[in-house]
Amino acid sequence: MKIYISIKDETQISFVAGKSNAHPSHVSRAEKRDDISVLKAGIVYGANASGKSNVIKAIALLQQIANGSFPQSKVEPFKLADTEEKNSKVEIEFKTKGKCFAYGIEFTIGGIKEEWLFEINSRTDKEVFTRKITAAGNEFTFGKVDGNEETSMLLKFIAHSTPSDSSFLSEYVRRNGKGLETIHMAKNWFADGLKIIFPSTRLQGISFLTENNDELQETTRSLLAYFNTGISDERLYKIKKEDVNLSSDLLDNILSKAKNGKAYSMAATVGGEMLLFEVNANGGYEIYKQKAVHRNLTSGTEVVFDLSEESDGSIRLLDFIPMLIDLKQNEVDYLIDEIDRSMHPMLSQKILECYFSGLESGRDTQLIFSTHECNLLNLDLIRADEVWFVEKGKDGASHLTSLAEFKPRKDVRKGYLLGRYGAIPLLPKEEMKW
């Protein structure tokens, strides 16, 4: 990353596993000579306004652009730069379906300037495509292209007609490009394999995922009991359409997602509430509301609560339970900004412990989050190379440092609070006179 919000010079954060033998289940180990060993967890610390959220924002922006959008309002270059270079840059290396890729872009508020995708391993980088936009238009180079002359001509047509505010990655998939099948793997990861949660993000909710799955319902109830929320279950309740203040634009958007006349469901926030829309093959739809079920300990009867009656912390936790189920069952990567927002500090640790307990050696998953919760700095729980610190320098730019560089002693938490690793607020010692 470089020249983006608080990031000035080219900066990287890496979750490639070091040589430590600690917590071996936390590592997706290389099976072949050229493979890359990858950590399954990452924790980012920093004081308020240090820039730790900007690291996640940069990846979220890259995801949006990879998926075909170019949100100009989120293109925020580093404003304190003393350099004439104006292009921002974000690149990510990721693993999906057993292959590792590097995808990146250089951009300004006006659009994409460069874009590239490489298939990588520990020794070599193999080009899939490289794109540069000049005054003459798109200039491309490609790696190995499979197929005949017709395939090659279609590929060149898509390449040279891709607009500057759209990624070639998304255009290739949208226009059914052929010859570079690894692009589909990379695009699918951005669309389905990378999931980013900000403090304002609401996931679809537990009941939307488990309504017709007895096994998932039982897993959900077990997690609700484990986190001691007081909620015994979550359920869907059908509501009348006339009781929902649904704008025509939102309804059109929901119904437009029907594909080939197939039934489907989707969640949407309406008036601050999460609702589930089930659309049948003919375009008819039903609306459901998610509610929390409590149990009266004296009588044993169930009492149903609207989610608006639950605390912010309980709702935040309810959003994380589908994530934990997803991580346990699928090869996905989650990034969370401020995991401890609105929650008791002990819950962050319980979420991490729950994730670690479900890790399996044959499944590549990853959970990365930013936090202030220093109780997680425990080498009995985590590896040193899983932890990064973000600190702002005098130039106003964010700088990143790995805990592994410090060769930490056992009591990492104490060292952090004493300022040994930086990334804490620098407050004046004298009293405020006001």
Residue ranges and their predicted role:
Residues A102-K257:
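Electropositive, glycine-dotted interaction segments
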Residues V90-K95, L117, A292-H294:
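Short beta-strand segments that buttress and anchor functional surface loops
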Residues M1-Q64, I287, K291-E430:
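Switch/communication elements of ASCE P-loop NTPase nucleotide-binding domains
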Residues V27-A49, S53-I112:
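Conserved P-loop NTP-binding catalytic core
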